[in-house]
Swiss-Prot record:
Function of the protein: Inhibits voltage-gated potassium channels.
Taxonomic superkingdom: Eukaryota
Propeptide segments, given as residue ranges: 20-41
Tissue-level expression: Expressed by the venom gland.
Signal sequence bounds: 1-19
Family to which this protein belongs: Belongs to the scoloptoxin-07 family.
UniProt-recorded name of the protein: Kappa-scoloptoxin(07)-Ssm2c
Keywords of the record: Cleavage on pair of basic residues, Disulfide bond, Ion channel impairing toxin, Neurotoxin, Potassium channel impairing toxin, Secreted, Signal, Toxin, Voltage-gated potassium channel impairing toxin
Location(s), subcellular: Secreted
Length: 74
C-alpha cells in the first residue's frame, strides 16, 4: 500500500510546488513595457519613419526609434 501512495503523494506535491512557481502571472507594468517596446520597434520599421521627407500630411521624425506617434508610423 505504501508503494502506491508514495508516488501519488510525490506527484501531487511536485505538481503543486511547480505549478505555484511556473504559473505566476507576469507583473502588468513589465508586460505593458514589453508590448510598448515591440510596438515602437514595429512602427520604427515602417518605410515612412525612415524617410526624411514624408508625403504631404504625414509627420515623421528623422530618427526612426523616436517615431512613436503620428500617421506615418502606423
Amino acid at each position: 500500500m505504501l508503494v502506491f501512495y508514495a508516488p501519488l503523494f510525490v506527484s501531487i506535491f511536485s505538481n503543486t510546488v511547480m505549478g505555484a512557481t511556473i504559473d505566476k502571472p507576469i507583473p502588468k507594468p513589465i508586460l505593458r513595457e514589453a508590448i510598448e517596446k515591440i510596438a515602437v520597434n514595429k512602427r520604427a520599421d515602417s518605410r515612412y519613419c525612415k524617410e526624411e521627407k514624408c508625403p504631404p500630411g504625414k509627420h515623421c521624425p528623422k530618427v526612426p526609434i523616436v517615431c512613436v506617434r503620428g500617421p506615418c508610423c502606423f
